[in-house]
Amino acid sequence: DGYPFIIVPLLLAVAAGYFINAYAVVPLLLLAAYFTYFFRNPSRTMPTDDHLLVSPADGTVVGVEEVEEDAYLNQKCRKIIIFLSIFDAHVNRAPLPGTIDFQQYTCGRFRPAYKEGVGYENERYSIGIHSAHTDILVTIIAGILARRIVSWVTLGDELQHGQLYGMI
């Protein structure tokens, strides 16, 4: 999904180098390099124990709180909030193996992700994963820069530990 963001600046750099000058190429090459970095997919070694949860995203844990979840789990649960900066990989992985038995896309705003309350205001996509050991709800929330949510899975899909299922 990131290829157009990388290829377009590279093509523009070639055109700028040909029609303008070499100095016009530099910002376009830097932009292509940044998009290559942004859309990267680092390899991860997943645990073999299906009881273990892995982080669904690279980033920084900025909050852990008890909440009453009423869309999928319908119970009190622990909510873990992970903030992705512009330097983090924006791919999302299944935190445990299981079957997707809930899916919900919600249109919304594109406020900065670090602002309080954006989890309920911004565009978001949630999947519920049913495993042999537990159920879990994972939500991807768009922000002011990462504004597009892409999902590669649908209801009924079986996910493996750490399998890619989407990106912001």
Predicted ranges, named:
Residues 1-168:
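Contiguous, well-folded functional domains in the mature portion of proteins
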